[in-house]
Amino acid sequence: MPGKLMLLPMREQGDNMAEKILVTGGAGFVGSHLVDALVERGHTVRILDNLDPQVHGPDRKPPVYLNPDAEFVQGDVLDTETLWRCMCDADVLFHQAARVGVGQSMYEILDYTRVNVLGTAKLLELLANRRSKHHIRKILVASSMSIYGEGAYCRASGEAVSPPLRPDAQMEHGAWEMLDPETGEVLRAAPTPESKPLQPTSVYAIGKRDQEEMVLSVGRAYRIPAVALRYFNIYGPRQALSNPYTGVAAIFSSRILNGRAPVIYEDGLQSRDFIHVSDVVRANLLAMEKEEADYEVFNVGTGRARSILAVAQGLIARLCPGGGVQPKVERKFRSGDIRHCYADISKIRRSLGFEPLVDFDTGGIEGLCAWAAEQEPEDKFEEATKELGKRGLV
């Protein structure tokens, strides 16, 4: 039964290549797809997930899509005994557990820090202090493109520039694009490499930066290969459509399915890199399997930018083809929001042979919409916006 700690040792597999794997956050969006792929490859998988009600609903029941061939433990990464009993016989640890929500992290500061930073610290402390009692050979942590702040930019000459965040005074006049701090000219967005200086602009982003730096640092110190994967904007089936702080594709889908306009800040031409969850899973598998990933950081994206307005229009065309809903471009802004950020994937392509396979327009969005149309999401966008607004964050 979920939540009980009468754990059996992870079973041995006949194939010597099969391993025992723990996935924290394995009932969530990315984690559950990763679990499916690991089970399919013959690995023995254990899931540790607290079934956060913001993601899984107030009854905190395991989702129907949870793989029946994986062992499920309902518990918190901050519970020392639960965490240790889940990880002590694992070979590989995928740390996906986290609270996710850039805006919400700016007022639920303690809880985001507790779960994301202290939860990771708890896991690493067990690795460090019980070294003789475990045989974990690799740890992989889910990081985020949010730690970059703004993406990379260049001048017309091609010279790279790392401008500061746009000042509120600029955006109050509807001047949305990034300006050269020296000349005032509009800068051109460029692919963002892993080497770009980090500029986290939210408590969530700060926590993600801390997670990856702690994992890499402790991994090096104890010679446990560690990998940090900086996810860009992930979309696909199993996104929490009723969570108003999740990805924009899910938020828009929830609005559209409830007959309401997706609300877009600024002018809608701000851009992100949207990657399908199946491609994110493949990146994780490559990082687990290849020594070239050890102690490295990788962007996990497509290398292509897409405007937020285009995403909204694509979802409307498929979820509300009659045209009863149109995007609502409000020309408002959220302080600290970035304008453009898309991935430079040359490193993960070169080192791990990764190539994104799912195109947003020709397959990815269709799968998301087919799944979303079968759901009955509760639209909580306005409730979340009020929470941000009363704190002056919108």
What are these model-predicted stretches?
Residues 6, 10-232:
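N-terminal Rossmann-like NAD(P)+-binding domain of SDR-like oxidoreductases, especially those catalyzing
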Residues 151-189, 203, 213-272, 277-286, ...:
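NAD(P)-dependent short-chain dehydrogenase/reductase
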Residues 32, 36, 40, 75, ...:
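C-terminal substrate-binding subdomain of Rossmann-fold SDR/epimerase-dehydratase oxidoreductases
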Residues 196, 200, 237, 351-354:
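Aromatic-glycine-rich donor-binding/catalytic loop that engages nucleotide-sugar donors
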Residues 54-56, 148-151, 238, 307-308, ...:
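A short beta-to-alpha transition loop/helix N-cap that caps and shapes the active-site region
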Residues 28-31, 78, 104, 122, ...:
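Short, flexible micro-motifs
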